[in-house]
């Protein structure tokens, strides 16, 4: 593992945490969290697989300046697509199965795939970055939910009432599994 990959992992974790919805922290069931992040990881791997070859084509033809434009267009198209799907669910089910946080998290997959699409990385190194980051966030969220359950039992302790503190703790906890894997691989 190179310093470049370590930097990518840190950036990925920061980007993922930026799009972690406050609803994720309120989820008390770890099975629901695992399902949600399994969907997010699989979707990100599909997007990454499609984007990798396009990115390499841009790099080969010295057109990398077009990547941010492509990125922004893709973000807006995905957000619109998820909004339309959400509206369809509301029409047919009278309620939405997917929150705005879920849609934001899915659109953020584009962001993390572009961090994984570093031109110095091979295809499988990028996959490794995505999987490590998603696993780190999932482990962190599961740790947070278990910590929160313990704090909820004692109403006198209100340490985790502040949203920024949650996200800071998630960031620190999400880096721990990645750092352990990096040290083990070296």
Swiss-Prot record:
Topology relative to the membrane:
Multi-pass membrane protein
Classify the main location.
membrane
Give the UniProt entry's GO cellular component terms. plasma membrane
Q: What keywords would UniProt list here?
A: Cell membrane, Membrane, Transmembrane, Transmembrane helix
Residue ranges spanning the membrane: these are 5-25, 39-59, 62-82, 122-142
Q: Where in the cell is it found?
A: Cell membrane
The reply on keyword Cytoplasm is no
Q: Which domain of life does the UniProt lineage start with?
A: Bacteria
State what protein this is by name. Uncharacterized protein BB_0073
């Amino acid at each position: 593992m190179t310093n470049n990959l370590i930097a990518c992992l840190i950036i990925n974790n920061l980007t993922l945490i930026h799009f972690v919805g406050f609803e994720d922290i309120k989820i008390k069931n770890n099975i629901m969290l695992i399902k949600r992040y399994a969907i997010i990881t699989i979707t990100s791997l599909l997007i990454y697989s499609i984007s990798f070859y396009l990115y390499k084509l841009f790099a080969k033809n010295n057109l990398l300046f077009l990547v941010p434009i492509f990125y922004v267009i893709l973000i807006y198209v995905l957000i619109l697509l998820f909004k339309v799907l959400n509206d369809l669910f509301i029409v047919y089910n009278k309620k939405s199965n997917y929150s705005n946080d879920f849609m934001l998290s899915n659109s953020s997959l584009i962001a993390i795939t572009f961090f994984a699409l570093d031109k110095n990385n091979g295809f499988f190194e990028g996959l490794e970055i995505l999987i490590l980051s998603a696993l780190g966030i999932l482990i962190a969220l599961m740790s947070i939910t278990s910590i929160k359950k313990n704090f909820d039992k004692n109403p006198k302790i209100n340490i985790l009432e502040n949203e920024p503190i949650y996200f800071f703790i998630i960031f620190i906890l999400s880096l721990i599994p990645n750092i352990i894997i990096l040290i083990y691989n070296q």
